[in-house]
Amino acid sequence: YEPKLNKKIVIEKIDTPSKSNLKIAARRCFDNMKKNGIRLGEENKYDFIFSIFHPFHLVPKAAVACGKELKIPVIIKVDDAVYQKAKGLKNLQRKIEKIYNSKTLQKGNRILVPNEYTKKLVHDYYNVSLNKISIVTNGTEIDNYKKSDLNSNQIIFSGAMYHHRGIDVLLESVLKVTKKIPDSKFVLLGDGPEMEELKKMVYGKEISKNVIFKGWVDRNEIPKYLSQSSIGIGPLRNTEVTRHALPIKVLEYMASGLPILAIKDTLPEDVLKNDENGFFVTDSVELSKKIIKLLEDNELRRKMGEKSKKMVTKFDWKNVAELIIQESQEVISLSK
């Protein structure tokens, strides 16, 4: 993956043991990340370090170690704060990870979280002082997204095919929808560990004419698919991972003027307002009813799509970037 970035951004690829296995590599990256981070810091005289947190990898731990050595502040951005609950050896692993994640976050100079729910979670679960936690939402470049063609019967999901996304719940609704609206299409963008099982489910239910797996799609192509759709699908399973989370894909749906459907208690209320820019549902049966309702009611679809477009303004990357700059300037001034 070679993203096109601003010429001022330099990518340094750090070799990591076990790099063919992402999860193992993420747990073995500390030494090389620390060593090279310190080297780069000494060469470039950075003002601060910015790191992205995830419960299973040690990059933020390496960032904190680099910050200590270089005597510069560390900002850590948290989106996925915790794992799903586990049993047996996995549960023991989670407990060990919680110990080092707690120490890492406690040593960070500023922790950025997307909302009040995550702020409280990071404070309670990792014992991080509320004084160092600030709310900075996720964002998207809303100018890149065109208003969707709300006259199509296309329902879209964009994202990783993980269990907690609940794509199986969406597939359970397909037959009910297609009986009522035979030409409806369910387009799935993305890849992941559940992909093959989901494909088996589609063939088993004989709904392959209405369900299209696109696999991994270049980010530049996503706006095109969204503009051809009428409904965006958010998280369809309520877990520790999805509860009150703010997936960027949902902001992209909103920027495209799509009504959104998601399982109750997943998306924050400033992203999905029930009956205003979409619906929260409780199961696949209610999901199918809401899809049918939206596809059959052009005016409702239009009004909800316009509400999504209006609500997404505060999540424009231009606004989010300003908040990150303010936080970094404050952290730098406090560290002097």
Q: Which residues does each PLM region occupy?
A:
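Membrane-proximal helix-turn-helix segments that form the acceptor-binding/catalytic region
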Residues: I38, L58, A65-L70, V82, ...
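Acidic donor-binding loop of glycosyltransferase active sites
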Residues: N109, L226-R243, L258-P259
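Nucleotide-activated donor-binding/catalytic signature segment of Leloir-type glycosyltransferases, i.e.
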Residues: E196-P223
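Conserved acidic donor-binding segment of nucleotide-sugar-dependent glycosyltransferases
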Residues: N274-V285, K293-E299
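A short, well-ordered alpha-helix in the C-terminal region of glycosyltransferases
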Residues: K293, L300-K314, L323-Q326, E330
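Short N-terminal targeting/anchoring amphipathic segment
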Residues: I38-L58, I72-I75
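Conserved donor-binding/catalytic core segment of Leloir-type glycosyltransferases
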Residues: L112, K147-V174, V187
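Carbohydrate-associated surface elements
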Residues: Y117, N138-G139
